[in-house]
Regions:
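Contiguous beta-strand/loop segments that form the cofactor/metal-binding neighborhood of enzyme cores
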Residues: 63-145, 174-188, 207, 220
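C-terminal hydrophobic helical "lid"/dimerization subdomain
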Residues: 196-213
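Hydrophobic side-chain positions on well-ordered alpha-helices
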Residues: 7, 182-183, 211
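Predominantly a Rossmann-like dinucleotide-binding segment in NAD(P)-dependent oxidoreductases
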Residues: 1-84, 91, 215
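C-terminal glycine/acidic-rich active-site capping loop/insertion
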Residues: 35-48, 52, 82, 126-200, ...
Length: 220
């Protein structure tokens, strides 16, 4: 993701005009109030209400699309302006799916999709496509097809080699823990999820949930 951020910042795809992104996972059980089956043999199990209670920020948006939007804002630096969202509700009243349209500052448009209906054992996926007036960037985290590809209008193609298996399922807690220790020790570090990124993510999802209820376009 940091490499994608560098490519966009270099100007190789020009001014961003449109972003389309999707995030999918196997979490229908959680959003209907059933404990996560993958945690059956764990000592500490997450409370299902964390994801299924609408009064506790339950739902696919807060539970999963927070990751999607944070990643998108990290690499694009866009600022949200207006949001419209439709969803499929779970029995507990939270969102199983999200179909979100965005208008960013400067007139950039975006289409964003979230879905909890991936079959168990598959893992789901996460991809970001950024289209500019000089080219496009394709970033895919789905397991066994990870890629970072840049194509420009003048025929350039940059294909960053990614080792198979380094996508969505390669994440561990080791790097965040190491970073926290570095901060405590006063060492230099790079914050890949700073407050500006997270603020834009919260503004976007807050507007999306307001739009679900109002069925209208909402200001982010």
């Amino acid at each position: 993701m940091a490499k994608a951020e560098e490519h966009i910042a270099s100007g190789i795809i020009g001014d961003i005009k449109h972003v389309d992104t999707s995030f999918s996972s196997s979490l229908v059980d959680l959003f209907q109030g059933i404990p996560l089956s993958e945690s059956d043999d764990h000592t500490f199990k997450p409370l299902a209400s964390t994801w299924s209670d609408p009064s506790k920020a339950g739902g696919y948006g807060w539970g999963q699309l927070s990751h999607m939007f944070a990643g998108m804002y990290k690499i694009t630096k866009l600022n949200p302006e207006k949001v419209f969202c439709m969803s499929v509700p779970s029995p507990t009243g939270v969102d199983y799916t999200d179909a979100i349209s965005l208008r960013f500052e400067g007139g950039v448009t975006g289409a964003f999709s979230g879905c909890a209906y991936v079959p168990k054992g598959y893992g789901g996926g996460y991809n970001i496509r950024v289209h500019g007036d000089k080219g496009s960037l394709f970033l895919d985290f789905e397991i066994n097809r990870e890629r970072l590809l840049v194509r420009t209008n003048d025929g350039q193609e940059i294909n960053e080699k990614t080792e198979v298996g380094c996508g969505t399922h390669a994440y561990t807690t080791q790097k965040p823990i190491n970073t926290l220790v570095d901060i405590c020790l006063g060492k230099e570090y790079h914050n890949h999820g700073d407050v500006s990124i997270n603020l834009k993510m919260v503004r976007t999802l807050d507007a999306a949930y307001r739009s679900m209820k109002s069925e209208k376009l909402e200001i982010a």
